Amino acid sequence: MLLAASVDDVEMMRILLAAGADPKIQTATKASTIMAATALNHGIGESLVTEAEAIDAVNLLLSLGVDPKGETTVGENALFGPAYRGWNTLLAQMIDLGVNVNAVSKAGTTPWRAANGQGDRLGGVLVNTEGADLLVKHGADPKLGVACESQNRCRDLK
């Protein structure tokens, strides 16, 4: 179920559900199927999945009672993937569902830093000003976390 969710394959998710798969399953690090569907562990260019497909997968999981508000053992939640990828419709949906806009990962990244190009992922990340502004509008504190420069993990965005 996690693999199907991570590629937002709604058809396969429905097949697995019909066969008894648990939509609330999590990884060892507590990543949920919703986190997988919101591209928590994907960088730009790693997947051909579209934001619309991700929204369809997330909506299916929400209809099955999967809680969108969880955090992994490293402190990431369902806002990080959309913030990194520039999926602002999905980002807004997760914010509206009450996902913590001020989550701070063990690497010092927040959803705001991820959107602003200051996250801890090397390569394949964009500067998502609209997403960063959306997060601030909903209470994100830009002072939280640690900029990638202090981690020596910045991408060359030039």
Question: Positions of the model-derived regions?
Answer:
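Ankyrin-repeat boundary/"N-cap" motif
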Residues: M1, Q26-G43, E71-A78, V104-G119, ...
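Extended amphipathic secondary-structure runs
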Residues: M1-G20, Q26, E71-T73, F80
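Ankyrin repeat domain, specifically the short helix-to-loop turn at the C-terminus of the second helix
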Residues: R14-D22, D56-D67, A92-N100, D133-D141
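Eukaryotic tandem repeat interaction scaffolds
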Residues: A28-A31, T50-N59, T72-E76, F80, ...
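Terminal, low-structured helical/coil segments at or just beyond the last alpha-helical repeat
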Residues: L122, V127-K158
